[in-house]
Amino acid sequence: MMQSESEFRKGYNKLTEKQRAELRFWAEELSHYVEWYQGRRRTLYKTPCPEENGQNGVPQLHVSAILTWAKLHQCPKYLHDLQLTKDAFRGLKVLDVGSGPIPSATCFEGADIYALDPLAEFYESIGYSRTPFPDVHFCEAKAEKMPFSSHFFDVVLSVNAIDHVDDFEQTAAEISRVLKPGGKLAMHVHYHPATECEPLELNDSRVRTAFSSVKGFAPCRRSQCSFTNDVLPPEEFVLWRNF
C-alpha cells in the first residue's frame, strides 16, 4: 500500500543521507524516463527513445514510460549483464537483491519473482507504481536482515546493487542463508571508488571471501562495458556466478 504524504514525510526524516540521495536519484530518473518516452531525450543510457508503436500506451504517462523503459532497457540489461536467457529460471523462486523501483527480474519468464529493496515503499510514493507488476512479491527490507526463512530461494540475483549495502559481509551471509543448497547465485558487480550511494569498494578477494560458502561461485566475465555504462580502468564490471 502506498504511503500517505504524512507517512512519507515521517519516514523520510528517518532515512540516512545515503538513502535520501538514492531517492533523489530515482525521482530524477523518473523524469528522464518520461522525457525519453516522449522523444525529448533521443537516447538514455545507450537506449534509443521508442517509436510510437513501441510505446506501452497505458493512460498514465509516467507509468507508460516506466513500462516501456522496463521492456526496452531494464529487462534486456538484466539478460545481458547476467549472460542469461529469459527462460533460465522457469518454475523457480527467484530473489532480486537491491531491485530498485523497477522489478527487472520479470525478464525471467515463468519465475516466481521476489524484489527486495529497503526503499520499496518510498519508491511508490515518488511515482513508481507496483500495479503493473501484480505477480511480483515486493519486499521492503535491508539485505543485511532478510525476512525469509533459510533455504527459501532456488535463485538469488543482484545487478549493480550489491555495492549499495551498508554491510557487505552480513549481506553475503544472508544471501547464503536464504539460498537453497545447490541453488543458483549470480551477481553483476561494479568495482569502483566509493560514492555517496555506493559506499563499498569491492574486489575479487573481498567478494570471494564473503561468499566462500557458496560452492563454485567465481568471476566468469569482466568488462569495462555494461549494458548501461562504460567505465575506465581500474573500474570494471564483473559477473560472478556458481553455474
What are these regions (language model features)?
Residues 185-214:
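Conserved class I S-adenosyl-L-methionine
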Residues 95-145:
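Class I SAM-dependent methyltransferase SAM/SAH-binding core
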Residues 221-243:
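Core SAM-dependent methyltransferase catalytic element
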